[in-house]
């Protein structure tokens, strides 16, 4: 079952990205390197509830 999640920047805490994930294959929190428009660089983004 796929669920929609929000990704939050770890440095500025802005929630910029929406994505989906399969909970069966990825049970832990998702962490991706994405571009942060506020900081204008690539930073680590973590899944929020």
Swiss-Prot record:
Please name the InterPro entries in this protein's record. Ribosomal_bL33 (IPR001705), Ribosomal_bL33_CS (IPR018264), Ribosomal_bL33_sf (IPR038584), Ribosomal_zn-bd (IPR011332)
What are the protein's UniProt keywords? Ribonucleoprotein, Ribosomal protein
Alphabetized Pfam families for the sequence: Ribosomal_L33
Question: Gene Ontology cellular component?
Answer: cytoplasm; ribonucleoprotein complex; ribosome
Q: Recall the GO molecular function terms of this protein's record.
A: structural constituent of ribosome
Record-level GO BP terms? translation
**Has UniProt tagged this entry with the keyword Ribonucleoprotein?**
yes
In terms of Gene3D superfamilies, this protein maps to: Ribosomal protein L33
Q: Which family does it belong to?
A: Belongs to the bacterial ribosomal protein bL33 family.
Q: Which HAMAP family match?
A: Ribosomal_bL33
- For this entry, the protein name equals Large ribosomal subunit protein bL33
Q: Which organism is it from?
A: Limosilactobacillus reuteri (strain DSM 20016)
Q: Gene encoding this polypeptide?
A: rpmG
